[in-house]
Amino acid sequence: MPLLLTGQEFRRDLERDGALALFVPLEGGAETRLMRRLRAVGYKAYLTSAKGLGDPEAYLLKLHEQHVPHLGRRMSTEGKPEGKSVGHVPKVMPMLGPLLEGKSPILLWLLEGQVLSSSELSAISNLPKREPRLKIVVEMGGARALRWESLGKLVESR
């Protein structure tokens, strides 16, 4: 069965390119096997959704502000906005902050990558060039068989 793969070719391509676009069968299972094999060779893995990512570089690697929906809005009475803005915007750690400590390689696995624009995908594909330990896998949708390609090449072809 082709899904019983060792993951060596996938790991080799991931380390060479830094960011891969992954197309997985809709019944699932293959991606978790690949992630488990990468964890076994020392990667610290973080799995999250690409929805609501915003500016990828700031959200993943930099100290940034988090705008809570109910803060920073004007209070209104009887339909008229009155008063000053309420609240302050807290600064939060980058999402990958704790994983960036140490020397082990980091794997960021983004689900639902098909919702990202070409500019967001381009920014994500450039992140491993800035942080060499960071490797990124973006699930780009379903396919009949498991396949992957360089995220940079996918962005260029769009």
Curated annotation (Swiss-Prot):
Annotated membrane topology: Peripheral membrane protein
Molecular function as annotated in GO: oxidoreductase activity, acting on NAD(P)H, quinone or similar compound as acceptor; quinone binding
Tagged with keyword Ribonucleoprotein: no
Cellular component annotations (GO), alphabetically ordered: organellar chromatophore thylakoid membrane; plastid
Catalytic activity: a plastoquinone + NADH + (n+1) H(+)(in) = a plastoquinol + NAD(+) + n H(+)(out); a plastoquinone + NADPH + (n+1) H(+)(in) = a plastoquinol + NADP(+) + n H(+)(out)
Enzyme class: translocase
InterPro entries with a match to the protein in the record: NAD(P)H-quinone_OxRdtase_su_N
Compartments in which it is found: Plastid, Organellar chromatophore thylakoid membrane
Protein purpose: NDH-1 shuttles electrons from an unknown electron donor, via FMN and iron-sulfur (Fe-S) centers, to quinones in the respiratory and/or the photosynthetic chain. The immediate electron acceptor for the enzyme in this species is believed to be plastoquinone. Couples the redox reaction to proton translocation, and thus conserves the redox energy in a proton gradient.
Protein name as it appears in the record: NAD(P)H-quinone oxidoreductase subunit N, organellar chromatophore
Native source species: Paulinella chromatophora
